[in-house]
């Protein structure tokens, strides 16, 4: 089946159960797709419940630690808050999102030439009323190793899942159409801005190469929240460390989810298919005697 990009820019939407190969083709062509019902209403409610006390703290301006000089936090507008360490804070993130079948089907297809992959970070992004337009940017790291143009392999993908509805009024994410292909940094008549309005539970699956940014939240009382799950190949260092998560918590996770947060080894592809992130040249979890929920996948 062929997915054709419409003449008028429009983000393709895929219902639950859609063919991952078709989704991946549209992703490669357009740089962004919408995965409808990525999380169920019950999962959305559970994440929102788990995050409620943490959101109350950041919305109140209460910070436990002062940011380091190079912290991402120093770049955020006062209205835009982030809660990181979801693997430590959210059971739904650990058990459901990190094991999401479609997320893994798509990640495997994108990063097949690199071998395994893991999470770059897991966070909730919370945008209060009055949050200004976010500057347009690419997520893929700007270092020369990765910033080599549209024909380079994908080095970064993101699953941005709405915890509330995204509308033009409350600041839905906007994308510069075709910017992942033509390597431009701002919109023009051939690369218009396309706004992604989605329902809670839908996920924006997009390339690290596409230029995008959140929009102005022009409401008086609506917070716009989402779970951001960026994924990178295992040859890249994650943004977030997870060594602080209690072992007893990690051992409630599947081996696949454990690998996603760096508690298991990853594997490089053929012809040099050896493990990486190892202990004594062998699988990290096995060497540590790490227990898990289920069995280690090959």
Swiss-Prot record:
Metal-binding in keyword set: yes
Biological process (GO), any one: novofumigatonin biosynthetic process
Disruption phenotype annotation: Completely abolishes the production of novofumigatonin, but accumulates asnovolin G and asnovolin A.
Record bears the keyword Metal-binding: yes
MF GO annotations: dioxygenase activity; metal ion binding; oxidoreductase activity
Gene3D superfamilies: q2cbj1_9rhob like domain (2.60.120.620)
Catalyses which reaction(s): fumigatonoid C + 2-oxoglutarate + O2 = novofumigatonin + succinate + CO2 + H2O
Superkingdom, natural source: Eukaryota
Keywords associated with the record: Dioxygenase, Iron, Metal-binding, Oxidoreductase
EC number: 1.14.11.-
Matches recorded under SUPFAM superfamilies: Clavaminate synthase-like (SSF51197)
Cofactor: Fe cation
Matching InterPro entries: Phytyl_CoA_dOase-like (IPR008775)
Pathway: Secondary metabolite biosynthesis; terpenoid biosynthesis
Transmembrane segments: none
Binding site for Fe cation: 137, 139, 212
Protein purpose: Fe(II)/2-oxoglutarate-dependent dioxygenase; part of the gene cluster that mediates the biosynthesis of novofumigatonin, a heavily oxygenated meroterpenoid containing a unique orthoester moiety. The first step of the pathway is the synthesis of 3,5-dimethylorsellinic acid (DMOA) by the polyketide synthase nvfA via condensation of one acetyl-CoA starter unit with 3 malonyl-CoA units and 2 methylations. DMOA is then converted to farnesyl-DMOA by the farnesyltransferase nvfB.
Family: Belongs to the PhyH family.
Subunit structure: Homodimer.
Protein name per its UniProtKB record: Fe(II)/2-oxoglutarate-dependent dioxygenase nvfF
Gene coding for it: nvfF
């Amino acid at each position: 089946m062929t997915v054709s990009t419409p003449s008028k820019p429009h983000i393709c939407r895929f219902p639950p159960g859609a063919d991952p190969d078709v989704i991946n083709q549209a992703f490669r062509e357009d740089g962004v797709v919408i995965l409808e019902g990525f999380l169920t209403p019950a999962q959305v409610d559970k994440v929102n419940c788990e995050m409620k006390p943490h959101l109350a703290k950041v919305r109140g301006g209460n910070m436990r630690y002062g940011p380091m000089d190079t912290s991402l936090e120093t770049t955020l507008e006062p209205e835009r808050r982030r809660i990181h360490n979801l693997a430590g804070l959210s059971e739904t993130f650990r058990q459901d999102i990190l094991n999401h079948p479609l997320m893994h089907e798509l990640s495997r297809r994108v990063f097949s030439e690199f071998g395994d992959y893991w999470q770059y970070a897991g966070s909730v992004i919370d945008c209060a009323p009055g949050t200004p337009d976010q500057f347009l940017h690419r997520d893929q790291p700007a270092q020369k190793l990765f910033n080599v143009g549209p024909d380079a392999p994908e080095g970064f993908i993101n699953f941005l899942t709405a915890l509330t509805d995204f509308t033009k009024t409350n600041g839905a994410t906007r994308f510069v159409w075709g910017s992942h292909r033509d390597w431009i940094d701002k919109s023009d008549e051939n690369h218009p801005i396309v706004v992604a309005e989605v329902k809670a539970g839908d996920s924006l699956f997009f390339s690290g190469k596409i230029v995008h940014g959140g929009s102005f939240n022009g409401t008086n009382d609506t917070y716009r929240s989402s779970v951001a799950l960026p994924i990178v190949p295992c040859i890249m260092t994650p943004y977030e460390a997870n060594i602080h998560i209690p072992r007893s918590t990690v051992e409630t996770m599947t081996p696949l989810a454990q690998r996603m947060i760096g508690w298991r080894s990853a594997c490089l592809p053929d012809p040099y298919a050896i493990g990486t992130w190892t202990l004594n040249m062998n699988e990290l979890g096995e060497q540590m005697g790490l227990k898990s929920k289920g069995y280690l996948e090959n």
